[in-house]
Each structure stands twice: as structure tokens, then as C-alpha cells.
């Protein structure tokens, strides 16, 4: 029994010990390499080869998708080169109705989406007005 415990203790020491016999027992620290930093470095090298220059003071950028949603960037990092724009930062995919100030940015090609939004707003307004009862004063009912 004691021999078994001694053998197990010796095995445990071998796994924990990182040096020789007289070294302190400690666990090896595992460092995880993040692949995103490598990808970012490669991207920055390619952008530097293109010769992009940063554009400051851009508050927002919107990409209009064919399905009616918008990819919205708030305070993006914008860089430009010849016929090339790079927009990076945190983005959100939102429906067009959730960002009403972008309607002014839409062109003639998005006229169908504007009509759909107007119909949806008017239908919602009509649905809400039916539920509100008419207020009647007690004096006029005599």
C-alpha cells in the first residue's frame, strides 16, 4: 500500500516539475497564440503595399444590402488608395427601419424599399389607432 502511494506521488511530481531534481515545483504556463493578430499583421502589410492613406473624422458608414438590411459602422477607420477604400471597425447588421436617418441617403434604386417602409409604417399607425377608444366627457352624455 505504501509502495503504491509512493509510486503515485513520484508520478505526480514528474508531471508538475519542470526542471531537475532540486528545482521548484510549478506548472508550465501555456501561452495561446491568437491567429487574429497574425491575420491583422498580414492585412496591414498588404494595405501598406497598396499605399493607403487614412481619412479622419468619419462618424459612420452604411452598406445597403439587397435584402433591405444595412451594415452599419459607427466611428469606422477609413483608409483610401487609388480606386480602393478600406472601412474597418465594429459593425452591426440592422434592418432599414431601425435607422430612419439613412432614408435620405437612399437613391432611386431603393425606391421599392422606401415604399415598403412607408406601407409598413402606415399599417402600424392604422393598427394602433383602432385600439384607442374615443374619450367622451360625462357632461355631454346627459
UniProtKB/Swiss-Prot annotation:
Predominant localisation class: cytoplasm
Gene3D superfamilies documented for this protein: Nascent polypeptide-associated complex domain (2.20.70.30)
Keywords (A to Z) from UniProt? Cytoplasm, Nucleus, Protein transport, Repressor, Transcription, Transcription regulation, Transport
Q: Which GO terms describe its biological process?
A: protein transport
Q: Does the keyword Repressor apply?
A: yes
PROSITE patterns named among the record's database cross-references: NAC_AB (PS51151)
List the subcellular locations.
Answer: Cytoplasm; Nucleus
Domain NAC-A/B residue range list: 37-100
Region Disordered, residue ranges: 17-38
Assembly notes: Part of the nascent polypeptide-associated complex (NAC), consisting of nacA and nacB.
Family of this protein: Belongs to the NAC-beta family.
Q: What does this protein do?
A: Component of the nascent polypeptide-associated complex (NAC), a dynamic component of the ribosomal exit tunnel, protecting the emerging polypeptides from interaction with other cytoplasmic proteins to ensure appropriate nascent protein targeting. The NAC complex also promotes mitochondrial protein import by enhancing productive ribosome interactions with the outer mitochondrial membrane and blocks the inappropriate interaction of ribosomes translating non-secretory nascent polypeptides with translocation sites in the membrane of the endoplasmic reticulum.
Q: What is this protein called?
A: Nascent polypeptide-associated complex subunit beta
Organism expressing this protein natively: Dictyostelium discoideum
Gene (name only): nacB
